């Protein structure tokens, strides 16, 4: 299912309340700790051997912030998310050889971080809107693999 007008309204009304560094660090940390095989893409980040090391790693925080900031920019291009991510998709597929399932995994980790941030405001309706967005982003980033 694509992004509806209501999804877009919900996303636009809540995204600006986030701190990209905090949410990004938590989401990427969750990805790296929950799916430890994803750490192979981040060997330059240093010690990722414990939860404490992952969740307090400055490189994880910086890259998480970069990813979440990119999603914020993609929100401004919801009519052409595939076009917005075309170059990044190509880079992830041809240069980094990232498993495209990791984009969906990151979306799941980001959903958990958003739920922790928004608490009661993270209704099933808001969750669904973000899931639609993250699915569209994962699809766009996976486009370079086709």
Curated annotation (Swiss-Prot):
PROSITE patterns: GLOBIN (PS01033). The keyword Transport applies. One of its GO terms (molecular function) is haptoglobin binding. It comes from the Eukaryota. Heme b binds at residues 63, 92. Keywords: Heme, Iron, Metal-binding, Oxygen transport, Transport. InterPro entries: Globin, Globin-like_sf, Globin/Proto, Hemoglobin_b, Hemoglobin_oxygen_transport. Involved in oxygen transport from the lung to the various peripheral tissues. Belongs to the globin family. This is Hemoglobin subunit beta-1. It comes from Xenopus laevis. The gene is hbb1.
